[in-house]
């Protein structure tokens, strides 16, 4: 849970900050455990936002209700959410702003066009796919993602000799199902791309990407910029 890892994360953030990093130059997007209740979302999201993160990634999302719990937890109670007004923490320090300015900026984009918090919602199960249109329709999602790696396991079977066999057609169908929901409800769609597939994924309509580490990751970034004319 968040309690077990928060101290380690804060120590890492402090080291980054001591080296000159801020939310403007080095924004953090952190991964949440699966949301099981509104109460969990309110408590654990507030704890992470209070450290100065700029985004929260919600994994294994399977219903619109979970999304609403998650997004409400990213908004102050005074803005209609469930984030306690007291949960400012040390966020203003990492953002490099006053507490008053942090409170103004720390709202959820795109519900607040000037908000500087963003949510990532990941669909990576059959149940999530069955509900993906309802999920995508919830206002306030920053980026909706198919959990491509997890979905590979979902659409794989194990042969008699123990070899894992992927149903490529079903897996790709799941990826496209999430993309279609994004397009229908005008939500940015993300994908974990590499140099071999970023061009086709951009052509399909994916607009947000995560890449791997090292030279291969940087090569993918450069290729993506070139393809986008940047």
Show which residues each predicted segment covers.
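Active-site-proximal loop/turn and secondary-structure-junction residues that shape catalytic pockets
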Residues: 1, 34-36, 60-62, 123-127, ...
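Glycine-rich, proline-tolerant flexible connector loops at the mouths of alpha/beta enzymes
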Residues: 1-12, 146-169
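Conserved anion-binding
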Residues: 43, 51-139, 148-153
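C-terminal helical cap(s) of enzyme catalytic domains, especially alpha/beta-barrels
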Residues: 64-80, 160-161, 214-230
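Active-site beta->alpha loop and helix N-cap motifs at the rims of alpha/beta catalytic domains
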Residues: 2-68, 73-76
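Anion (oxyanion) recognition and catalysis
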Residues: 179, 183, 202
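Short, electropositive alpha-helical surface patch
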Residues: 55, 196-216
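Hydrophobic faces of well-ordered beta-strands that scaffold small-molecule active sites
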Residues: 26-33, 56-58, 119-123, 144-146, ...
């Amino acid at each position: 849970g968040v309690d077990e890892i928060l101290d380690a994360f804060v120590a890492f953030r402090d080291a980054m900050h001591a080296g000159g990093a801020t939310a403007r130059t080095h924004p953090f997007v952190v991964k949440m455990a699966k949301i099981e209740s509104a109460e969990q979302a309110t408590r654990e999201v507030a704890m992470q936002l209070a450290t100065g993160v700029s985004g929260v990634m919600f994994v294994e999302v399977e219903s619109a209700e979970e999304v609403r719990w998650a997004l409400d937890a990213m908004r102050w109670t005074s803005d209609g959410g469930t984030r306690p007004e007291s949960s400012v923490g040390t966020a203003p320090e990492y953002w490099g702003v006053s507490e008053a300015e942090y409170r103004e900026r720390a709202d959820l984009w795109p519900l607040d066009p000037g908000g500087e918090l963003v949510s990532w919602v990941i669909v990576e199960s059959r149940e999530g796919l069955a509900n993906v249109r309802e999920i995508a329709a919830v206002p306030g999602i920053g980026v909706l993602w198919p959990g491509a790696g997890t979905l590979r396991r979902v659409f794989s079977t194990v042969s008699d000799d123990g070899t894992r066999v992927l149903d490529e057609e079903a897996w790709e169908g799941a990826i496209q199902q999430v993309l279609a929901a994004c397009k229908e409800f005008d939500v940015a769609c993300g994908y974990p791309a590499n140099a071999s597939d970023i061009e086709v994924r951009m052509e399909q309509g994916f607009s947000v990407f995560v890449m791997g580490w090292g030279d291969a990751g940087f090569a993918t970034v450069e290729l993506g910029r070139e393809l986008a004319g940047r």
